[in-house]
Amino acid sequence: MGTMTPAQRRALYESARFARETTYNGPLGPEYTPAGTRLQLWAPTAEQAAVNLYRKGHDSPCIGTLPLQRGPQGVWSIWLPGDQHGHYYTFTVTVDGVARETGDPYARAGGLNGLRSMILDLARTSPAGWERDVRPVIPPARRSVWEVNVRDFSQDAASGVRPAWRGKFLAFTQTGTTLHGDGIHPTCLNYLKRLGVGYVQLMPIFDFGSVDEAKPLLRQYNWGYDPTNYNFPEGSYSTDPARGEVRVRECKEMIAALHAAGIGVIMDVVYNHMYRYENVLNNTVPDYFFRQNEDGSLSNGSGCGNEFASERPMARKYMIDSLLYWAQEYHIDGFRFDLMGLYDVDTMNAARAALDALPGGRDILMYGEPWQGGGSQLHRYEANKANLAMLNERIGIFCDDTRDAIKGGCFNAREPGYAEGKPGSFWDVGGAVAAWCRSDRLPPHAPSQIVSYVSAHDNFTLWDKLLCVRYERPEFTASDPVALAQNRLAAGIYLTSFGLPFLQAGEEFARTKKGVGNSYHSSPALNRLDWARARQYHALVDYYRGLLALRAAFPRLGTTDRHAPEALQFFSLEQPLVGWALPAAPGDGAWWRALCVFYNPTDTSRVVPLPAGRWKLLSDGTSSSLWRGESRTYEREALLMPYSATVFGAV
């Protein structure tokens, strides 16, 4: 094709002719059989392509280079006879006379730091009983998400996890762990089972480039939003990153253990950008997979130097094939899309349709961040809040409107929200309760499309935010009764709202990062889950636990019915109090005929009128488990504690 400038490449890639002549719908990557392995690589602009063979995934010489044969649609392939399980390889792809050695972008395993790809018999990586592993059945009423980083989960020495497994996939498989091994205070998987969350959302577990797997991890840390290989797990989370099959097997063992505990696994996927410009996709088809400005330079809507061109046919195929692979091979239960606003609506809906076609695929969750990290050259409908009505009803969005209404803006540490007493914010809290289905702030949507939350890995933890609002110089490790009450109030609001409830791991035990608002590469010590705080703040943990169970006992809050929020009846109360009632849906198995809920963000007790009838106190400002016993019933009026969410059930 001759030497081309980036601008010329852009014109070529966006031409109908290129799409027509190069779009390929078949399998790519390694296809293993005991008799031999076929490698297939899509590289339509390449003049030559060859495979380089290695015995090891690092520090070993090339033992041979073989040419690939070009076929239709620009697919290059080669048949390697014999059992190739455990063998490593790279490609050398020549474009415009420049030869680049690269890993296989379609590889399913790799060596140290993912620099070399690996051929695997995937059946040999499956743990015992894997063929019987199935996705837990989690009805909408029980859906809730607990977000955690693999390292954070268990790297605390007090976690009770065996030292070799701390910060690893295998930490999720160890049962019966307790704080310092005391046999009393549960940690890790033991803790999760007791907490009662429906899903664990794992921050990036695919192979990323910001941690060197060849070096000790003692001082290394990164969240992992730096993809290098999309289709196999990160090696630093395995017990042996040099052996490519180990990370695959141990990741499956983690998922199997969570499934056995009745917990679904949601994977945080970051297709929107790659770690560096020199990457497996760009080395194979320069500039094709990344959105370009008119002059051919890279668009940077991710804020990371590049952004994925989801609208280009083979980029869309790459992303959807990857999702399907994780869902099928690893039994993933859901996907959280980082910077989902960088994908076009058509790609997201096509991904939903592809997952739906799998056995049980309609139960796989999809939701993401409906924003971008900068200006983008995406000139199609973006998968953002403004286009929510164009997305499939089973694609959700993180709702920053809910987050900011409850706890205050995330970019100003001292800006209060409703829980901290911000004047006028009660209007937005009403919108949040209804999942914004009764507001013109968002296009028409189902309540289940709204991810209701107040904290995630980005920005301040809820505890740190509450203290920053209250104090000019907070003492983050000190206990604070008012902040604790405000924490309970914040949880009480989003856990009694329509939508999908979501919390950052440790929010329920006042997790602190000591005021660090972006800890993506801070120390392991700062980022770890401090399991001693789960003991210290056990009453707060129990408050979350009780609300999660209470929510499950009133299924209408988790409904997918877009008309359900219309049944909410809001009360006329003295500002800034908020109160509402919601009847149970007929035949949904609710424990109570209706819920009546009040929020009081003030520092004084308040008396409020109750609707007609008898109302059992289910949860007040300190205990969310009153409904489990013979709690008091009320008629006509009730007293609200300061900084409280109070829940009644009609009896």
Where are these regions (language model features)?
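Glycine-rich phosphate/pyrophosphate-binding loop
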Residues: A109-A158, I397, D401-S479
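C-terminal beta-strand-rich structural cap/linker in extracellular carbohydrate-active enzymes
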Residues: A43, G86-H87, E630-V651
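Loop/helix patches that line or flank the sugar-binding groove of alpha-linked glycan CAZymes
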Residues: P444-K616
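Active-site-proximal helices and loops of the catalytic beta/alpha 8
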Residues: G64-R70, L218-R219, G224-Y225, L339-P444, ...
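Substrate-binding/active-site clefts of carbohydrate-active enzymes
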Residues: R151-Y330, R336-P359, L365, S376-Q377
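The feature marks proteins involved in alpha-glucan
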Residues: M1-P34, R70-Q174
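Conserved, mostly hydrophobic/aromatic
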Residues: L41, F91, V148, L202, ...
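Structural beta-strand segments of beta-rich domains
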Residues: A35-L39
